[in-house]
Amino acid sequence: MVFYTIGPQTPQIDKGQIYGIIGYSGAGKSTLIRLLNGLEKPGSGSVTIAGQDIAQASVEALRQARLKISMVFQHFNLLWSRTVSENIAFSLQISGTSKSVIQDRVQELIALVGLVGKEQAYPSQLSGGQKQRVGIARALANNPNVLLCDEATSALDPQTTDAILELLLDINRKLWLTIVLITHEMHVVRKICHRVAVMEEGRIVEEGEVLSLFTHPQQPITRQFVKQTSGYISANVPFNPQLVNIDNGKVLKLTFVGQSTQQPVIGELTLKYGLAFNMLHGIMTQTTNGTFGEIWLQVPASQSQLPRILADLHAYEISTEVVTNV
């Protein structure tokens, strides 16, 4: 699936990929969703899904294409007078599926999303997470090729959000289903996405693998999103600078990626140089592309020792930055 109507970049979403699109309110995320399902047409360029340009499709071709492009909504959009089973069956009924097939398919989907025992419950009897599971099951009913999730977890609490993300990841693995995930939360991207596009003012300003964007964000807005998961959104550093004795050496920010996250680097440097390194803050982050970590370290080294310590860190393939704004 390729879309290149927004901005100079041309993202390509491969089959079976979970692709995140992140941006703040007004960035153009909802417009992009409407382009992907043909509710809006681009002023120029094209939106190509499975070899078909959605923007140029006839009314009938677009109707057929939409059967394979499903939506999961932020506020569930369930029919409140219908049971769980009836809500899931609805999309099969309007596509002309026979009753016998509908019954089997509904039971299969209820098991897939973990709602066994809730078949006859009404939406008013369900929690927010259960309602979203019904929405996901309904979206999967016609075996779509693409699942569009528009802020599917933003109305949920953190624990339920993680449960829904795990469900989407499980569905992606079992069905090899392409998922496009619209969100304003970097936690959602980190948790399940393979690649991500960052939107600002109607344009895609940065795009790439999730791990790459976390470790080497290029745009200011991307760096702002990355800070969401680092615990210091409104500060330059994730610790209280007043607790640091600036006369006692330098403060280094170390970034570990992949194998370097598993090495006892600080312990080995302590033994080698006989210095009492002071760890000010540390965090380890897991993405679908791998693990990376950040450590802020006060190094009580002399002017002659510091270059050697930096060289040792580089030998471990650890990125270093001397923090000057403490």
From Swiss-Prot:
<keyword id="KW-1003">Cell membrane</keyword>
<dbReference type="GO" id="GO:0016887">
    <property type="term" value="F:ATP hydrolysis activity"/>
</dbReference>
<feature type="domain" description="ABC transporter">
    <location>
        <begin position="1"/>
        <end position="226"/>
    </location>
</feature>
<keyword id="KW-0997">Cell inner membrane</keyword>
<keyword id="KW-0547">Nucleotide-binding</keyword>
<comment type="function">
    <text>Part of the ABC transporter complex MetNIQ involved in methionine import. Responsible for energy coupling to the transport system.</text>
</comment>
<dbReference type="GO" id="GO:0005524">
    <property type="term" value="F:ATP binding"/>
</dbReference>
<keyword id="KW-0029">Amino-acid transport</keyword>
<dbReference type="GO" id="GO:0005886">
    <property type="term" value="C:plasma membrane"/>
</dbReference>
<dbReference type="InterPro" id="IPR027417">
    <property type="entry name" value="P-loop_NTPase"/>
</dbReference>
<protein>
    <recommendedName>
        <fullName>Methionine import ATP-binding protein MetN</fullName>
        <ecNumber>7.4.2.11</ecNumber>
    </recommendedName>
</protein>
<keyword id="KW-0472">Membrane</keyword>
<dbReference type="InterPro" id="IPR045865">
    <property type="entry name" value="ACT-like_dom_sf"/>
</dbReference>
<keyword id="KW-0067">ATP-binding</keyword>
<comment type="subunit">
    <text>The complex is composed of two ATP-binding proteins (MetN), two transmembrane proteins (MetI) and a solute-binding protein (MetQ).</text>
</comment>
<dbReference type="InterPro" id="IPR003439">
    <property type="entry name" value="ABC_transporter-like_ATP-bd"/>
</dbReference>
<dbReference type="GO" id="GO:0033232">
    <property type="term" value="F:ABC-type D-methionine transporter activity"/>
</dbReference>
<dbReference type="InterPro" id="IPR017871">
    <property type="entry name" value="ABC_transporter-like_CS"/>
</dbReference>
<dbReference type="Pfam" id="PF00005">
    <property type="entry name" value="ABC_tran"/>
</dbReference>
<comment type="similarity">
    <text>Belongs to the ABC transporter superfamily. Methionine importer (TC 3.A.1.24) family.</text>
</comment>
<keyword id="KW-0813">Transport</keyword>
<feature type="binding site">
    <location>
        <begin position="23"/>
        <end position="30"/>
    </location>
    <ligand>
        <name>ATP</name>
    </ligand>
</feature>
<dbReference type="InterPro" id="IPR050086">
    <property type="entry name" value="MetN_ABC_transporter-like"/>
</dbReference>
<keyword id="KW-1278">Translocase</keyword>
<dbReference type="InterPro" id="IPR003593">
    <property type="entry name" value="AAA+_ATPase"/>
</dbReference>
<dbReference type="InterPro" id="IPR018449">
    <property type="entry name" value="NIL_domain"/>
</dbReference>
<dbReference type="InterPro" id="IPR041701">
    <property type="entry name" value="MetN_ABC"/>
</dbReference>
<keyword id="KW-0614">Plasmid</keyword>
<dbReference type="Pfam" id="PF09383">
    <property type="entry name" value="NIL"/>
</dbReference>
